Amino acid sequence: MTIRIAINGFGRIGRNVVRALYESGRRAEITVVAINELADAAGIAHLLKYDTSHGRFAWDVRQEREQLFVGDDSIRLLHEPTIAALPWRELAVDVVLDCTGVYGSREHGEAHLQAGAKKVLFSHPGGNDLDATVVYGVNQDELRAGHRIVSNASCTTNCIIPIIKLLDDAYGIESGTVTTIHSAMHDQQVIDAYHPDLRRTRAASQSIIPVDTKLAAGITRIFPQFNDRFEAIAVRVPTINVTAIDLSVTVKKPVKACEVNQLLQKAAQGAFHGIVDYTELPLVSTDFNHDPHSAIVDGTQTRVSGAHLIKTLVWCDNEWGFANRMLDTTLAMAAIGFRFDA
């Protein structure tokens, strides 16, 4: 069965979801029937075809009135600001991928369902009242058919959760800190301009800018046992894509850096293949652009202090890796069916 999806919000993640779908060869499993985006149709087509981070899209893209064509596939374009008015029932939409970055509450999810969608997947963290939050590769097996409103967590949560799980399973984590070194985002300024967050009033291309993060809450949402045992900070840096995460954890069992690397490399080749990758090459952030993994461990940066303090550096393409996980989670949601009494 081919899953019929609609995308609500066609920004960085929405466009990368479409590109990832076509590049990954999963069009027999998923088809995009509609895109809802307030921008004009010509702009939608142009930004899908041409992308500063990911280059020119390999598929032919054209737009005719309110239809977007990717190759021979036709996708209906909508410009509807009200979720409840979207024609999901008419279009027989199985799963809505809400990639607005704005909506994320149960109320918003239920509005999509009332419009006729069978299930909803948010591309960002949602409230505690959602049916599930999935970090694919770690907890997708907990999905049930009755889980209709789901969050795919965040790009940084998807990056760090598999590594935390591996270290905790092997050595027993007592506590940890996380520093996210994140590329600039759309909520920052090109030149100095007003913003409620005074640090974000400053030009994104000229400063390393500390910002708030809810990553610690994201960790404890997946692993409740770490409540009050993880803290996180974040800085934005003047690059347009790829993120590095500095993870430091104290563990119960004594360990050496080489043993940590052996553990993570084995996982990348085995149970977490396709989700986690491992490298010891002398690479920099641009080398991880367009990498589909959730996390790439840089083994050259692993350190252990006093046998119990582990520091790792983990890379991710915060756009492309996350877009691929959106597709994975969509398939997982569809695989368990659309019976809602389970």
Curated annotation (Swiss-Prot):
EC number: 1.2.1.72
Residue(s) at site: Activates thiol group during catalysis: 182
Keyword flag Cytoplasm: yes
EC category: oxidoreductase
Alphabetical UniProt keywords: Cytoplasm, NAD, Oxidoreductase, Pyridoxine biosynthesis
Binding locations of NAD(+): 12-13, 318
InterPro entries from the UniProt entry: E4P_DH_bac, GlycerAld/Erythrose_P_DH, GlycerAld_3-P_DH_AS, GlycerAld_3-P_DH_cat, GlycerAld_3-P_DH_NAD(P)-bd, NAD(P)-bd_dom_sf
Entry GO CC: cytoplasm
One term of GO molecular function: NAD binding
Keyword DNA-binding: no
Amino acids binding substrate: 154-156, 200, 213-214, 236
Family, per entry: Belongs to the glyceraldehyde-3-phosphate dehydrogenase family. Epd subfamily.
Function description: Catalyzes the NAD-dependent conversion of D-erythrose 4-phosphate to 4-phosphoerythronate.
Record note on quaternary structure: Homotetramer.
Protein name per UniProt: D-erythrose-4-phosphate dehydrogenase
Source organism of this protein record: Klebsiella pneumoniae subsp. pneumoniae (strain ATCC 700721 / MGH 78578)
Organism phylogeny: Bacteria, Pseudomonadati, Pseudomonadota, Gammaproteobacteria, Enterobacterales
Gene name in the database record: epd
